[in-house]
Amino acid sequence: GTYTLPSLATVFHALYSAGGVNQVGTLRDVVLYRNGKAFKHVDVYGYIMNGDNTFDIVLQDGDLINVGTYEKIVTILGKVKRPMRYELKGDETLSKALEYAGGFTGDAYKKNLNVTRKGDSEYEMYTVYNEEFPEFVMANGDSVLVDAILPRYENRVSVEGAVFRPGKYAISASIATLKDLLDVVEGPREDAFLNRAILYREREDLTR
């Protein structure tokens, strides 16, 4: 529609006055026409994500703003700081999508991600390793789920029973043997049965 705006109104003011972009509209390539010609291509993400207002151009009388349709919409869910749908354009990659999502949270599993893609007749799954994130080009409709790291430890031991300082300890250079561990827990108490101690070791399948 046609809008009357203040003298210093910008492209963003005009979009706001128009009620924003609808579900199929693009935020990545809003075109400002001036004197019948394309004057500037505006990427709203530059302002939203980075505070870059170089594209927030002051409008002139008779300017036309054209909002086309989006090129790609992808969904980033799980352990990222801003899980939601994002619009991508051109050859933007998984790394760029994760950047828009604010990056990983502290408990995110980062070694690889599974990307679900809509094929012609069924879904396809891609396992993308972290060194491939900058090269993996996203497609329209892609969905990424960032899982959490496993709630278990790779270097923890637990000491229970008749010792002075039972608890959980980290396996390290200073605690590498059972004797080291007994030194840290300050040895057995006076009421401890010294003829036997039981060592449980948890396997990768969580059995003992």
Give a label for each model feature:
Residues 1-208:
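Ser/Thr/Pro/Gly-biased, low-complexity, turn-/loop-rich segments
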